[in-house]
Amino acid sequence: MVLEVEDEFSSVWRQVGVALERTGLYVVDSDRDQGTYVFRYGDRAGTGGKEILMEVHLLARESNLTLLTVHRH
């Protein structure tokens, strides 16, 4: 799945970080230069007690267009 956001990378980067924190997901690592956040979630998501690492990738396509993808780390 790819989410297309009509905003510049720096703004989307901040918004994604805030959204992850507000939803209670634990950010394990982030790299703004690479455009990645790695976060973990656990049993609340129905994983049977196992924690799963997920990764959000941000890619600036144009000056005001950023693409987001999410997948297992």
Residue ranges and their predicted role:
Residues 1-73:
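Ser/Thr-rich, low-complexity intrinsically disordered terminal regions
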